[in-house]
Amino acid sequence: MAGTRFSLLRAALFAAALSCPGAALAVDPPYQAQMERLAGAMGSLYFLQPLCGHSEIDWRAEMADLIALDEPEADREARLAGAFNAGYEAYARFYRSCTESAREAMRRLLIQGEEAARDIHSRYAE
């Protein structure tokens, strides 16, 4: 299930990156907010999944791949990395062990990531 969602995330971001010929401009693309939400969700999952014994996806490596696909300028890249780190830190402050709440958060984060990817794909890649 997570693999299918990630494939959708990757496809959406790849398509969005290809559809923005003006990416060299210092103006944020219209999907920047969704990208930052997606980055935050991935950072949170990077913390929570190993905590709960689910480490089949290396979210940090996947985030690096998505940034590479998007080819952002330095400022945008820093904001995406910052959103990823903020997502990680938000859950690291409150969770020391896997709880039912942590498992529910993972479930919601996967849904949020999937929704962000679908939104990016449907609005900007077609």
What are these regions (language model features)?
Residues A12-L18:
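Localized chelating/binding microdomains
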Residues M1-A12:
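Bacterial N-terminal signal peptides that target proteins for export
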Residues A26-L66, D119-E126:
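N-terminal secretory signal peptides
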Residues T4-F6, L25, R118:
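Residue-level marker of intrinsically disordered, low-complexity segments enriched
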Residues E56-E126:
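Compact alpha-helical subdomains of small soluble proteins
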